[in-house]
Amino acid sequence: DWMRRFEADRTLDMMTVSIDSFKDHISRSLGRGKGDHTKYVKRAAELCQTFDVDLKINTVVCRSNLNEDMRESISELDPFRWKVVQMYLVDGMNTNVDNPLHDATDLAITREEFETFIKRHEDVQCLQSEPNERFIRAYLLLNERMRFLSTSEGGKETDSILDVSVADAIEQCDFCSEKFIERDGVYFERRNHNHEYCDGDVAVD
């Protein structure tokens, strides 16, 4: 029902969903869903088609899904953009060996392994590959304490945006707008009521 509210005035142009595996037992082991994540992703894709909303899919490639072939499943979902990211370890976020819920070190893969996944899916036209080097300083990561994390300085935290402005917090981290643009972080122009794209209205990712 909530999507219908956006249908008349076209205030919703794009929806992003994350799916790391189309095998639900793997998704569950990675913390996505309770064994039914694929069903909900497919439902989201159906809603996007029904309401003429562009679908974007994010996938993080790690040890658990490295050998999976997702070509058919991605084709069925028909996203306009499929962002495939090499799993990235950030100190303070997913490298806490004392807390299994926050320790993903065993899931890390090499650049060469990541490229085997990309090679397998190279015929998927909407694929956008992001190895680790494209990640560094090109993302803003926000932890549960509402602090931005550095992606190149060992997970260094900023002040919480509950205490300072977002602009001030960004000044404290290593985010680089040039690298953000370089990795194609600005890519989507908003559509007007006639389904035509408008200059200057963009989505960032």
Each PLM stretch: what is its role?
Residues 24-202:
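Radical SAM enzyme [4Fe-4S]-AdoMet core and its adjacent flexible, acidic
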